[in-house]
Amino acid sequence: MIDSTTLSKLALESGAIRFNPDKPFIWASGYKMPIYNDNRLLLGKPEYRTFVAQLFKRLLENLTQNIDVIAGTATAGIPHATTLADILKKPLIYVRASAKSHGMGNQIEGPLAPGQNVLLIEDLISTGGSAINAVNAIRKEGGIVNFCFCIFSYGFTETYKKFEEINCQYHSLLSFQTLL
């Protein structure tokens, strides 16, 4: 069982979740919403980072698939993936939104061998675009991604459908519905 009540309190205390129904926030997607989520603020205290990673670990224990590698989405998913990878003693990779235009031109940084089972960590899922992009990038390099975990999700029906279409489940520690 995930302790969403405690996580809700930590998110509100840290300012990671803010409400303003009178003056909605404008998201990058253009949506106007009465809530704003910035999970990077959960990074400010080691006990918050560890708590989030322990919740991810509990979610992972319920899966039937062994995980070889932990992946974080750039940039906000990386620190949470790092904390989880450290706890689990697993290799870590991270996935950029797009390949670099210089150097090796990598979209994925870190060791990934074809056939490895990868757990993707994202801080926030709204429309799912960045996480799905990361799943596709990992699969293109031969990684197997069947699961994506996030700290917070808005629980949009369309987002669940998009993840179903690519045969990847996503699970959130905290959802908009839980907060209400």
Residue spans for each PLM region:
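PRPP-dependent phosphoribosyltransferase catalytic core
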Residues: I2-E13, N136-L180
